[in-house]
Amino acid sequence: MNFLDESFLLAVSFVIFIYLIYRPAKKAILNSLDTKIIEIQEKVLKAKKLKEDAALLFEQTKVQIQKLEALRSQMIEESDKATQKIIQDKTKAMEEFLEQKKADAIQLIQNQKLIASKDLQDEFCDEVITLVSKYFRSVQLSERSIAKNLMDKSDFAHNASHATHLH
């Protein structure tokens, strides 16, 4: 093998050519790879940041949901209390109304009872007067003798009660 052989020189020249081309290309490839690595690292950092932000947002949302649940429970409890109070107030008002109506009805019944009793007394008195008048007319007494009889009986009753007071 001859070192000056053309195929050997061609091979050495090709290796040198590749080396000379590879050297600047190596820098460009390494720079390109470094740039890609930096871009990927930035994307990974952004993804981590997004993940952390999402986790933080999730926790904040979870806290807000818990607060809303507590607020909802409180509102339900307050509305239940308000409803119970309204029911109690309306029940009390209804009971008072019914008691008032009951008292009014009792008063009305008593008034009607008094009116009916007075009407019966008036009818009874009218009937007694009519019967007494008919009796006195039937026995053919004059009005004067009727009045005298009534006066005598009235004086007798008055004297009798006066006499009992003296004893």
UniProtKB/Swiss-Prot annotation:
It is found in: Cell inner membrane. The keyword Disulfide bond does not apply. The chain crosses the membrane at residues 7-25. The keyword Translocase does not apply. It is a single-pass membrane protein. InterPro entries: ATP_synth_b/b'su_bac/chlpt. CDD domains: ATP-synt_Fo_b. One of its GO terms (molecular function) is proton-transporting ATP synthase activity, rotational mechanism. GO terms for cellular component: plasma membrane; proton-transporting ATP synthase complex. Keywords: ATP synthesis, Cell inner membrane, Cell membrane, CF(0), Hydrogen ion transport, Ion transport, Membrane, Transmembrane, Transmembrane helix, Transport. It comes from the Bacteria. F(1)F(0) ATP synthase produces ATP from ADP in the presence of a proton or sodium gradient. F-type ATPases consist of two structural domains, F(1) containing the extramembraneous catalytic core and F(0) containing the membrane proton channel, linked together by a central stalk and a peripheral stalk. During catalysis, ATP synthesis in the catalytic domain of F(1) is coupled via a rotary mechanism of the central stalk subunits to proton translocation. Belongs to the ATPase B chain family. F-type ATPases have 2 components, F(1) - the catalytic core - and F(0) - the membrane proton channel. F(1) has five subunits: alpha(3), beta(3), gamma(1), delta(1), epsilon(1). F(0) has three main subunits: a(1), b(2) and c(10-14). The alpha and beta chains form an alternating ring which encloses part of the gamma chain. F(1) is attached to F(0) by a central stalk formed by the gamma and epsilon chains, while a peripheral stalk is formed by the delta and b chains. This is ATP synthase subunit b. It comes from Rickettsia typhi (strain ATCC VR-144 / Wilmington).
